[in-house]
């Protein structure tokens, strides 16, 4: 993978004259261009939307830039929900994916009208008890076993073991959860899955889609 720095050493030296170190420099042009590229790549899918993981870079300026480019945010904690709200995200702008979720976090996600993604079958009754069941709801799928891709063009081998992960539901749990959610008033259902970390190969996405659909 070619590394193309957006900042020259000379430019960095110039910035140092005015800004105390340490500091971070972000490429706004590059961020906007990449957001537009991914939106264009999936423009065939009317319902597509990119959700940026706030935990990756909880910087309000970056979040506002991505909001201007039509992106939503993926939150996993109360702090991330509050930050996203302060940046103007609300409702379907927010995907809330959390593990062992505290009551306050779940209530906040519900109050914001966020898409809530349940990672455990026991969370159905928990959500109903502490906040209520929204019309739109997601469940996280864990197919179990081992997930493996061949070596990528970059020379990386992608492998992880969803079967050892403590997050996500089996197919049977997914079906039971959807039935319970439907009985409690949910109307629209989504599927979420995260099968391997640090994947940089494009082959991951069609493989994952094949498992889900």
Language-model-detected regions and their locations in the chain:
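A charged N-terminal "starter" segment
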Residues: 1-116, 121-135, 150, 175-189, ...
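Active-site loop/helix belt of alpha/beta enzymes
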Residues: 145-213
């Amino acid at each position: 993978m070619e590394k193309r720095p957006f900042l020259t050493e000379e430019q960095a030296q110039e910035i140092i004259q005015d800004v105390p170190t340490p500091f971070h420099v972000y490429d706004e042009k590059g961020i906007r261009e990449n957001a537009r590229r991914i939106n264009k790549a999936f423009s065939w899918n009317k319902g597509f939307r990119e959700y940026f993981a706030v935990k990756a870079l909880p910087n309000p300026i970056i979040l506002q830039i991505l909001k201007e480019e039509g992106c939503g945010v993926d939150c996993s904690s109360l702090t991330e929900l509050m930050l996203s709200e302060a940046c103007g995200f609300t409702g379907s702008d927010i995907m809330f994916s959390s593990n062992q979720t505290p009551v306050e976090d779940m209530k906040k996600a519900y109050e914001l009208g966020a898409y809530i993604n349940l990672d455990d079958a026991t969370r159905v009754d928990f959500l109903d008890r502490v906040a209520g069941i929204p019309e739109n709801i997601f469940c996280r799928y864990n197919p179990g076993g081992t997930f493996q891709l061949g070596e990528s063009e970059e020379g990386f081998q992608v492998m992880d073991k969803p079967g050892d992960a403590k997050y996500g539901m089996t197919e049977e749990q997914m079906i039971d959860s959807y039935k319970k959610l439907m009985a409690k008033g949910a109307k629209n259902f989504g599927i979420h899955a995260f099968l391997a970390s640090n994947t940089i190969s494009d082959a991951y996405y069609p493989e994952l889609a094949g498992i889900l659909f």
